[in-house]
Every structure is written in structure tokens, then in C-alpha cells.
Amino acid sequence: MSASAFVAVASCLAALVHGYANPGSCSGACNVHDPALIRRQSDGKYFRFSTGNKISYASSSSIQGPWTVLGSVLPSGSSINLDGKDDLWAPDVSLVNGVYHVYYSVSTFGSQSSAIGLATSSTMDLNSWTDHGSTGIQSSSSKPYNAIDANLFNDGGTYYMNFGSFWHDIYQAPMNSAATAAASSSYNIAYNPSGTHAVEGAFMYKYGSYYYLFFSAGICCGYDTSRPASGEEYKIKVCRSTSATGNFVDASGVACTNGGGTVVLESHGTVYGPGGQGVFTDPSLGPILYYHYVDTTIGYADGQKLFGWNKIDFSSGWPVV
């Protein structure tokens, strides 16, 4: 057996042992960090937003691609007057009252001087986006949270913004009826009291009678210069509740506000550090977990991260990929 064939077989066996399917296929522009996915109502075209290039975005006829880069959502940066306004992170996309909303983060790495902003478009065409600045969800060193990693959730017409990264981890803020601004104060819905509180990137998805709170846990970035200890790299976890606003627990019954979280996807085979996830209902494939990851046969740099996706099986009551 050739060396390359041996590596391929070993990678497949590793994936089977851990029980994770390998990422679905991707063609075209597949380098991505913190992806966010939506289909346009008018024609079914897929749009994928990501960190970098003042919120880069691409389109495709399917989740597999071929993905074509369109450009930047906000080529002039954000109107929010904070450091990082020209380096926007972690987009989240939703359709609200017939208008496409892209929420984005303004911050710098390791800082709590952060804000969640909003850009809107009725078409998602290039150069059609209007920046509305801050949603009012902001943080400073006086806050228990970091106002980045936005995720809007629509619970039957009532909107909630999930957000947060490290510090006291994941918070939720009720939004106004237009989902343009926070309507009242935020509260904690997930927290790991141990270590550096390495929880971020929340994404909420309802399936059946449960609300599932997905999040990324561990160290996200810089793997090419400083590899984390084994198991401390990014992975995707989940808790669930019968309410959108709290009481989330993992499969063992541990509260998500006390370190709970059941692993959905972690490093396996040549897949390393999956995270920055979302969940998307594909008309052909059903529920899809999408994320970024490192292919260890290509490289560990942040700019080499790839778009991954797997079908989700909810038959056990918990997401399995």
C-alpha cells in the first residue's frame, strides 16, 4: 500500500471510530472563517457570509458549490466608532420582514470593547447593503460579556439575539419587532466556569419541541503558530431546552450555565478544530450543520480554513453528524 493510500485509509478509520462523517463536498471558493448561510427567497440561490474583507460573501446554486465570491457587504467598513470597524467578524444572516439582515461584530482580538452592528439589503446583491451601525448590544470592560458573535433567533415572531465570547460566555437579548435593536437587557444562557471560559459562537435552532443551543468551545485560531494541547482546540457542542430563553441542559442533564455541553463535532481524521458553526434547513438535504475547519493535509493557518457541512440526524433527540 502506498503512503498516500495508507493515510487515506487511516483517516477514514479514524472518522468511523469517532462516529463523525467527513465534511460534505465543496467546490469553488471554499476558504472561509465563521460562515453564515441563507437561501434567497426569490430564486433559491445560496449566499454564504464570512469573517474578513469587511464581511466577504459568496453565492452558489447549492451548498456544495461551486461558490463564487461576490465581494464585501460593507466595503467602507462599519459606522461604529470602535477599533476593528474596518475588520468585521462573525456575520449572522436572517430574513426579517422581507429584508435580509447581516449582523456583524466590531472588536479587536482579546478586547471587550466590542459591538454588534447591522447591515440590510432587500436583495443581497453586491453594493445593495445599508449599514445601520450598532444594534445597541455593546460591551466594555465593565460588562460581564463580550458583545461579538451575534445570532438572531426568531421564535414565532419574537426575536432574540444570542451573543458572547469568553468572559461569562453566552448571553441573550430580546430584540424589537424589526430585529434592529435590543429591546431590553440581556441575561446569561451558557457559561463554562472553568479555565478561560472558552465558549463562543452561539447558534440557536428549533427542531421538534426543543430549542438547540449550539456553540463553539476551545481555542479557535492561530494553529499554525501555536497548536493547543490535544482536545483544547475548537469543537462544536450543544445544549437543549423547551424554551428559547433559558434552562438549557446537555445530554447528561448538566446545565449549560454550569459547564454543560454535549459534543456534536470535534477533530477527527484530517478534520481539525471544527467550529464557527450554524444550522441550516436545506430543501433537499434537511437540517445541515455547517462550520469552518482545518484540513491537516493542507495547512493550519486561519486563511486555510475550509467550509464544511454535515447532515444532522435528530432521531435520538440530540444532533448527530
Swiss-Prot record:
It catalyses: Endohydrolysis of (1->5)-alpha-arabinofuranosidic linkages in (1->5)-arabinans. Keywords: Carbohydrate metabolism, Glycosidase, Hydrolase, Polysaccharide degradation, Secreted, Signal, Xylan degradation. It is found in: Secreted. Transmembrane segments: none annotated. Its main location: secreted. One of its GO terms (molecular function) is arabinan endo-1,5-alpha-L-arabinosidase activity. Disulfide bonds: none annotated. Its EC number is 3.2.1.99. Residues 1-19 form the signal peptide. One of its GO terms (biological process) is arabinan catabolic process. InterPro entries: GH43_arabinanases, Glyco_hydro_43, Glyco_hydro_43_endo_a_Ara-ase, Glyco_hydro_beta-prop_sf. SUPFAM superfamilies: Arabinanase/levansucrase/invertase. The active site is at D34, E200. Pathway: Glycan metabolism; L-arabinan degradation. GO terms for cellular component: extracellular region. The record marks D149 as: Important for catalytic activity, responsible for pKa modulation of the active site Glu and correct orientation of both the proton donor and substrate. Endo-1,5-alpha-L-arabinanase involved in degradation of pectin. Its preferred substrate is linear 1,5-alpha-L-arabinan. Belongs to the glycosyl hydrolase 43 family. This is Probable arabinan endo-1,5-alpha-L-arabinosidase A. It comes from Neosartorya fischeri (strain ATCC 1020 / DSM 3700 / CBS 544.65 / FGSC A1164 / JCM 1740 / NRRL 181 / WB 181) (Aspergillus fischerianus).
